[in-house]
Each structure stands twice: as C-alpha cells, then as structure tokens.
Amino acid sequence: VKDLNLEIPKGEFLTMLGPSGSGKTTCLMMLAGFETATHGDIMLNGVSINNIPPHKRGIGMVFQNYALFPHMTVAENLSFPLEVRKLEKSVREEKVARALDMVEMGGFKGRRPAQLSGGQQQRIALARALVFEPELVLMDEPLGALDKQLREKMQFEITALAHRLGITVVYVTHDQTEALTMSDRV
C-alpha cells in the first residue's frame, strides 16, 4: 500500500472497493494492528496508534470467516473481548445481553457456532465486534460466504445498525453493488 491518506469522520460508513490483491485487506490489517505500516502514522482521534497492540486499540473487527471460537457458546464468544479488558462479570453479562438484543439473537446465547446458520454466525460476529462499544469497526468482506438473499438482508441490517449506533465503519469488498448500497463513501 503506497501513499494512502485517508480521513474518516466519526459515524461514517466508508467502503474500500477494489479487486483481489489491491491492498484493501492490508489496509484493514494495518488499522487493526495485525500488520505494521512501514511509513507514516495511523491516527485514531488525533492520536497515533502505530505502537499500540491490536487488543488495546479499541477497534472491532468482523472477518470474512467470522472467526468465532467453536468451543465457546455464543455468550462466551461475546464475553471474550470483555474478559480481555478485565470487566466485571455483571458488566460483561449486561453488555453481552445488550449486544445480542441489538442483532436480534437474544435467545441464542447458549448455542455453539456449529448450531447456527451462516446468517446467525454473521450476526454473532457483528455483535462480538460491537460488544465493547468500539469507536471503529473494521469489516473484511463479512458477507462473502452468504447466499444472495441473505447477503442483501444483512447489507441493510449492518448499515441500519451502524447508523443507529453512530459508529464509524471501514468495510472492505470487491462487490460494487454492495459498496454502493451500504456506504456513505466509497
């Protein structure tokens, strides 16, 4: 990735659109802290986050494969990022319940990922990215594994939820229709 200068206002839904190999996911990985920028600064709210480890950046992430822990229940998957942040059990339980309600999955907290459909897994991955109330959520082609009908439904749901919560989203896709449907800016 060369000469990227990007400013994203709070609450914007920005999509990075391009073909495979164009650097979209690399940009997300640098924002998340999983890859290191060789030059320049990555700033969040005016503060450089270049030397801050991924788990301390306060950034939510939804991957294409959802990255849910198969040995954990839905509630345990959502609670994990809160445990890493050392929140008390009562606070974790409250935040997990709120996040599950946000994605209309409140009745699924005791299930394991293998017991969920692709769309349900996608909602749980989204809830996990939002459970700790991040300022920024990164999404790397999260709808790629879904069928057309469910993908279109989830496009609407993700966009509506992001705007309702006022969160900033950086979304990666190679699908032009998806980008134009969901984004404030492409």
Put a short name on every predicted segment.
Residues 152-165:
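Helical segment within the ABC ATPase nucleotide-binding domain
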Residues 64, 166-172, 174-175:
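Conserved H-loop
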